[in-house]
């Protein structure tokens, strides 16, 4: 019998968090009971260690907090919560937000412009998100803002800047870079053929290696059926790094649904 961590007797001053309800989103339906229990344990620790900061009047209740924590912890389910030690705060806007962006062009001129962002992440500093896109991260569509920003944090553990290569053994770096760049080229070829809007993988993945790793991490967890057959070698590298196989998880969930359907009387 699985001993659910949120069903343990709590002290009188502590309010039980709605973990069971928080788990009931499409992205997490394929998890086994053991995985759910482990994920909740990590998410509880996440909420103890990190500060969720609502901005611009956004209201953060216990269910929203739990679901945010679960999504943060899904990528590190097997890696461990220490992989998320590069930040202490999560800032949450109600909707995409405007920031001042500074960039340098090819001839060295510095430009400033205001742009709309869904999320932001720095090597040392808070993660910035918005609730509208967090809500869109609950399904299995290939889009997941939280996993995208977590991937950037995991990426920067390997050095001063995001490179698209997370902290893996040195002997595996060349193979990882080869497969990642091959995926970027393949995605770019599709974009040139059908256009960004019709591409089957988010075109942002072709912009640079760091974004490719972050975008494909979204697909790894929320649309493995699109990632695995298209980039099988890179898929295996992601499975080895994250120590998870979401495609196998998806097949198990589908088999369970089929079995249940055939046994309805």
Swiss-Prot record:
The keyword Metal-binding belongs to this UniProt entry's keyword annotation: yes
Entry annotated with the keyword Cell inner membrane: no
Signal peptide: none
Keywords for this protein: Aminopeptidase, Cytoplasm, Hydrolase, Metal-binding, Metalloprotease, Protease, Zinc
Enzyme Commission number, as recorded: 3.4.11.-
InterPro entries: MetalloPept_cat_dom_sf, MtfA_enterob, MtfA_fam, MtfA_N
GO molecular function: aminopeptidase activity; metallopeptidase activity; zinc ion binding
SUPFAM superfamilies: Metalloproteases ('zincins'), catalytic domain
Gene3D superfamilies from the UniProt entry: Collagenase (Catalytic Domain), Glucose-regulated metallo-peptidase M90, N-terminal domain
Required cofactor names: Zn(2+)
A single Gene Ontology CC term: cytosol
Cysteines joined through disulfide linkages: none
UniProt subcellular location: Cytoplasm
Single Gene Ontology BP annotation: proteolysis
Transmembrane segments: none
Subunit structure: Interacts with Mlc.
Biological role: Involved in the modulation of the activity of the glucose-phosphotransferase system (glucose-PTS). Interacts with the transcriptional repressor Mlc, preventing its interaction with DNA and leading to the modulation of expression of genes regulated by Mlc, including ptsG, which encodes the PTS system glucose-specific EIICB component.
Family affiliation: Belongs to the MtfA family.
Protein name: Mlc titration factor A
Annotated organism of origin: Shigella sonnei (strain Ss046)
Gene that this polypeptide is encoded by: mtfA
